[in-house]
């Protein structure tokens, strides 16, 4: 396996996004959790596929929270820069563009700033069908 940075350096973003799309379709199956990368929603075909083939949950967190997480994460060096900006600026720029895509693709929006147990409870509640009246 290669990191995203290695794949992008060797083959470019377009090739990476094609492989990402193939992977989405390959791993999608009933009763399966698929955690995608943030760029998955850039393709309209991916957005449609995800909405039609599963329950899409957007794990929302403000840009400053995401920036802090990326700065602390050891795998941060494996992530190629999308804009060439500092992490905080890049996250704000990218999130501003992608947030509407995430929101229109998602069936539910979860507060990813909450403690992990709360996020899990939100996800479980989101998957349950509505109670009968």
Question: Language-model segments: which ranges?
Answer:
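A glycine- and Lys/Arg-enriched "phosphate-lid" helix/loop adjacent to the NTP-binding pocket
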Residues: 52-99
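NTP-dependent small-molecule kinase module
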Residues: 55, 68, 96-133
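Short glycine-rich anion-binding loops that position phosphate/pyrophosphate groups of nucleotides
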Residues: 38-41, 62-64, 115
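ATP-dependent small-molecule kinase phosphotransfer cores
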Residues: 1-40, 44-51, 72, 101
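Short beta->alpha linker loops
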Residues: 22, 61, 86, 114-118
């Amino acid at each position: 396996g290669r990191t995203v940075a290695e794949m992008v350096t060797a083959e470019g973003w377009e090739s990476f996004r094609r492989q990402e799309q193939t992977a989405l379709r390959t791993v999608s199956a009933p009763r399966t959790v698929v955690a995608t990368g943030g760029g998955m929603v850039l393709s309209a075909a991916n957005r449609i596929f995800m909405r039609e083939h599963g329950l899409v949950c957007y794990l929302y967190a403000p840009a400053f929270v995401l920036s802090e997480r990326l700065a602390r994460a050891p795998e941060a060096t494996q992530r190629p820069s999308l804009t060439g900006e500092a992490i905080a600026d890049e996250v704000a720029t990218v999130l501003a563009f992608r947030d509407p895509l995430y929101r229109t693709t998602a069936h539910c929006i979860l507060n990813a700033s909450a403690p992990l147990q709360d996020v899990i409870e939100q996800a479980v509640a989101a998957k349950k069908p509505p109670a009968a009246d």
